[in-house]
C-alpha cells in the first residue's frame, strides 16, 4: 500500500482563488478591500523569504498589503507604538509580526499588544483562550490549515487516536485543542516523552511538529494512519526534508503530507483566510 498524498499546494491554491473571488465581490458591493500589515524586524534570511511570500499572496488575492521593514536595533517602544497605530487604523484588518524577533525584544508582550480582532496569526492569549473554550474566533494558522488538509481526506476524525509530536505554542498546543474539538483522543508528545515510537505506533493520526529532521521513523507509523508532517528542515545539500522519514512512511501510511508542498502553503493561505474573516465579521 502506498499512501494518498495530501496536496497542500493545490488545496491552498484553491483557497486563495476563493478568497480572491470574495475580494472581487466585496469591491462590486462597494465594500472595503481587506488590509494586512506585515512587520519584519531585522534581516533574518528565512524571515525575509517568508514575508516576501506573504506579500505576494496578498497581491494575488487583491488585499492591500502594508510593509514595515524595520532595522534590527528597533526598540520595544518603537515597535509598540507602531502596533498601536495599526490597531487604530480602520484600513488594517490584520497585523502580522514576523517571528523570531531580535533577542532584545519581548515577543510575548508585542504579540499581546496586537488587538485580538486583528491578530490574524491567532497567537494572542485571547484567541488561544477562545479556542480552548470551544468558541474559536481567529484560529492559529498552521493548526487551522492542518484541519483543512484533514477535511480533504474525507476521513471521519471522531474517536481517532491522535498523537502530536511537539508542544510549541505555535503548533503543538493549539493543534491539540483543534483535534479535541474534532472529537479525537489526543496525546501530546515532547522531549521528555518516553517511548515515542510506541505512542506513534498506536496513532490513527500523527501530527509531527518538532523541528528535528527524520525524528519519526516510517516503521513506527501504524498501517493506514494519517501522517501530517509540519517540519521543514534544510539539509547540507540544500534539500528540504520533514520531521518524518518520508520514504519509509509512504508505504505504511494511508494519507501523508509531502515536504515541501504540504502544510507550509496552507499556513500562508489560512493567514489570508483569517484576514478576510476579520474584515467581513469583525470589522463590518
Swiss-Prot record:
Pathway: One-carbon metabolism; tetrahydrofolate interconversion. Transmembrane segments: none annotated. CDD domains: NAD_bind_m-THF_DH_Cyclohyd. GO terms for cellular component: cytosol. Catalyzes the oxidation of 5,10-methylenetetrahydrofolate to 5,10-methenyltetrahydrofolate and then the hydrolysis of 5,10-methenyltetrahydrofolate to 10-formyltetrahydrofolate. Belongs to the tetrahydrofolate dehydrogenase/cyclohydrolase family. This is Bifunctional protein FolD 2. It comes from Pseudomonas putida (strain ATCC 47054 / DSM 6125 / CFBP 8728 / NCIMB 11950 / KT2440). The gene is folD2.
